[in-house]
Swiss-Prot record:
SUPFAM superfamilies reported for this sequence: Lysozyme-like, Plant lectins/antimicrobial peptides
E.C. number(s) listed in UniProt: 3.2.1.14
Pfam families according to UniProt: Chitin_bind_1, Glyco_hydro_19
UniProt-listed InterPro entries: Chitin-bd_1, Chitin-binding_1_CS, Endochitinase-like_sf, Glyco_hydro_19, Glyco_hydro_19_cat, Lysozyme-like_dom_sf
Catalytic activity: Random endo-hydrolysis of N-acetyl-beta-D-glucosaminide (1->4)-beta-linkages in chitin and chitodextrins
Intrachain disulfide bonds: 35-50, 44-56, 47-74, 49-63, 67-71, 110-172, 184-192, 291-323
Gene behind the chain: Cht2
Record-annotated Chitin-binding type-1 domain positions: 33-73
Gene Ontology BP terms: cell wall macromolecule catabolic process; chitin catabolic process; defense response to fungus; polysaccharide catabolic process
Signal sequence bounds: 1-32
Record: active site: 154 (proton donor)
Tissue: Expressed in roots, sheaths and meristems.
Record GO terms (molecular function): chitin binding; chitinase activity; endochitinase activity
Protein name (Swiss-Prot/TrEMBL): Chitinase 2
């Protein structure tokens, strides 16, 4: 039989346990990333900056180096309503169109045959709902065309006299052929795992440990320890490309913001000749090697894919397609892209 004092003690302990459980739950919720690539491309409320780590705030820690979105406030463009599941990428890219766009990806001569599936593309896109879900229908289609245009160049198996033309052979490769190195650079934040190599893999030919690390963290996979997943798991492969597409890096906007009209050039951008359009995306992806020195066959190839895909969607390409006269964002390649 318990005494009143014992009963009071038990009640106090029960209350303390309840408070501890509540505190743990609140702490877990507080740790969940709020925005950016870590949260499926979400933007912060009330025009807050999204830090490189996926948190919302207003100080330089959030709005400074690595800021992912709304780094100078929302600007004049309103944040779009997130698409409902019924308005996902599949609603503008039905299976038959996907097959026509990537016509020869499963050709017997393509090393990636059978890898890049429609199902994997949709599954990866669902993790980034703003991709192909921002703006009106034409803008949504143009973003998919631009994404497939850039990634088709990175994975092309085409040649000038190829059947159905050179721009029907995107997604022929899934990893770099004969990589010259292990693409490991010393990094305390993204250390290379023993024996692992970070050469180009996937639609964007993701390269270097400093890209595999943050890409893996954003999609919930340890790619520093398992870089081969980008060439063996098609959904992971597409997700890494979409992570790169959706994520601003350094002084570069995201490709997503450029093609959807959410990016406005700064005075420095204008002075560098960087104007809104597909050409800036090429600059983001590989400007250090391809932009700013006049006509370049690689840039023309990227444009060729994009024009074909826009034609298949029945939309215009917009202006400023090349980066021939744009100063690069960096002095070198942003991804360490592989030339097939």
């Amino acid at each position: 039989m318990s005494t009143p004092r014992a009963a009071a003690s038990l009640a106090k302990k029960a209350a303390l346990v309840a408070l501890a459980v509540l505190a743990a739950a609140l702490a877990t919720a507080a740790r969940a990333e709020q925005c950016g690539a870590q949260a499926g491309g979400a933007r912060c409320p009330n025009c807050l900056c999204c830090s490189r780590w996926g948190w919302c705030g207003t100080t330089s820690d959030f709005c400074g180096d690595g800021c992912q979105s709304q780094c100078s406030g929302c600007g004049p463009t309103p944040t779009p309503t997130p698409p409902s599941p019924s308005d996902g990428v599949g609603s503008i890219v039905p299976r038959d169109l996907f097959e026509r766009l990537l016509l020869h990806r499963n050709d017997g001569a393509c090393p990636a045959r059978g890898f890049y599936t429609y199902e994997a593309f949709l599954a990866a896109a669902a993790a980034f709902p703003a991709f192909g879900g921002t703006g009106n229908t034409e803008t949504r289609k143009r973003e998919v065309a631009a994404f497939l245009g850039q990634t088709s160049h990175e994975t092309t198996g085409g040649w000038p006299t190829a059947p159905d033309g050179p721009f029907s052979w995107g997604y022929c490769f899934k990893q770099e052929q004969n990589p010259p190195s292990d693409y490991c650079q010393p990094s305390p934040e993204w250390p290379c795992a023993p024996g692992r190599k970070y050469y180009g893999r996937g639609p964007i030919q993701l390269s270097f440990n400093f890209n595999y690390g943050p890409a893996g963290r954003a999609i919930g996979v340890d790619l520093l320890s398992n870089p081969d997943l980008v060439a063996t798991d098609a959904t992971v492969s597409f997700k890494t490309a979409l992570w790169f597409w959706m994520t601003p890096q350094g002084n570069k906007p995201s490709s997503h913001d450029v093609i959807t009209g959410r990016w406005a050039p700064s005075p420095a951008d204008a002075a560098a000749g960087r104007a809104p359009g597909y050409g800036v995306i090429t600059n983001i992806v590989n400007g250090g090697l391809e932009c700013g020195h006049g006509p370049d066959d690689r840039v023309a190839n990227r444009i060729g894919f994009y024009q074909r895909y826009c034609g298949a969607f029945g939309i215009g390409t917009g202006g400023n397609l090349d980066c021939y006269n744009q100063r690069p964002f960096n002095s070198g390649s942003s991804v360490g892209l592989a030339e097939q």
